[in-house]
Amino acid sequence: MKQPSNWIEGMSMELKKKKKLAVCVPFRDPGDGVRDKHLAEFVPYMNQFLSERGFDFKIFVAHQCDDKLFNRSAMKNIAFDVAREEGYDYFAFHDVDMLPEDGADYSYPNEHPVHIFTNLSQWDYRLRDIEYFGGCVLFTKEQFENVNGYYNDYWDWGMEDDDLFWRCY
């Protein structure tokens, strides 16, 4: 194996070995513009946050445009399917209204799914609920396929994260 001749070449070789991260964001603005504002803040923030840390990533926003109740599960599964087809290795299922702070680790989840937002500023950095599995969770492709993704029969807000938690653990 050829050894790098300098630091820049070494970094280039290391970057080629990186896993590709898909940030999967379910999205729907209920008409009040609040979620649109969240998305307008989320995308540039995440681009900067992940770029500064050297991640190879792409943000996939699955936007539900019909008048039915929001199906966050279906939007997450759709984003996963598209990202998987594009060859991504692991997936961050991310709420649009939650932004990571320094210390949030989006690294490849080797052994099991990883819940990134266990302690949030909105809860004074205390764990809200031992079973809370929302905000942002990381899965490898294999881990997500093994639990068969999110269950698509949860409509409106909530429960899909709890259901996934129980199927993972």
Model-derived features with residue positions:
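N-proximal low-complexity "stem/linker" segments adjacent to membrane-targeting elements
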Residues: 1-48, 52-55, 61
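Short coil/turn segments at beta-strand junctions that form active-site/ligand-binding loops
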Residues: 19, 87-89
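Short loop/turn motifs at secondary-structure junctions
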Residues: 55-56, 87
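C-terminal interaction modules of eukaryotic adaptor/scaffold proteins
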Residues: 64
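Conserved catalytic core of nucleotide-sugar-dependent glycosyltransferases
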Residues: 67, 71-76, 80-83, 90-94, ...
